[in-house]
From Swiss-Prot:
Functional note: This protein binds specifically to 23S rRNA; its binding is stimulated by other ribosomal proteins, e.g. L4, L17, and L20. It is important during the early stages of 50S assembly. It makes multiple contacts with different domains of the 23S rRNA in the assembled 50S subunit and ribosome. The globular domain of the protein is located near the polypeptide exit tunnel on the outside of the subunit, while an extended beta-hairpin is found that lines the wall of the exit tunnel in the center of the 70S ribosome.
Any one annotated GO CC term: cytosolic large ribosomal subunit
Keyword Ribosomal protein: yes
Keyword tags: Ribonucleoprotein, Ribosomal protein, RNA-binding, rRNA-binding
Originating gene: rplV
GO biological process entries: translation
Record-linked CDD domains: Ribosomal_L22
Name this protein carries in UniProt: Large ribosomal subunit protein uL22
Domain of life: Bacteria
Gene3D superfamilies assigned to the protein according to its UniProt record, in alphabetical order: Ribosomal protein L22/L17
């Protein structure tokens, strides 16, 4: 049985979050939470909230046991990009892309 949680339109680049997603993929949920707690990145705080939500969804909606859960998927997909302009020399302007993400975590029950 799978339970998932998604945080949409999070104002952080997907590249930065996917770097941390790779660390927790396939880990037991308590181990993944410990890794996220001691990772000094903004993306880790976001992933921690989404993972806690996925765990709560698994326990409440499906009655799954927390000790049997592991992170089967952790991902950050592209969301809409805000475009801003930076003034440059000789009256020119360069674009600044402020990227955002859709962060998702799927937890599954470990098969024995």
């Amino acid at each position: 049985m799978q339970a998932k949680a998604i945080a949409k339109y999070v104002r952080i680049s997907p590249l930065k979050v996917n770097f941390i997603c790779k660390e927790i993929r396939g880990k037991q949920v308590d181990e993944a939470l410990a890794i996220l707690k001691f990772t000094p990145k903004k993306g880790a705080r976001i992933l921690e909230k989404v993972l806690n939500s996925a765990i709560a969804n698994a326990e409440h909606n499906f009655g799954l046991n927390r000790e049997d859960l592991f992170v089967s998927q952790a991902y950050a997909n592209n969301a809409p990009v805000m475009k801003r302009w930076r003034p440059k020399a000789k009256g020119m302007a360069y674009p600044i892309l402020k990227r955002s993400s859709h962060v998702g975590v799927v937890v599954e029950e470990r098969e024995l």
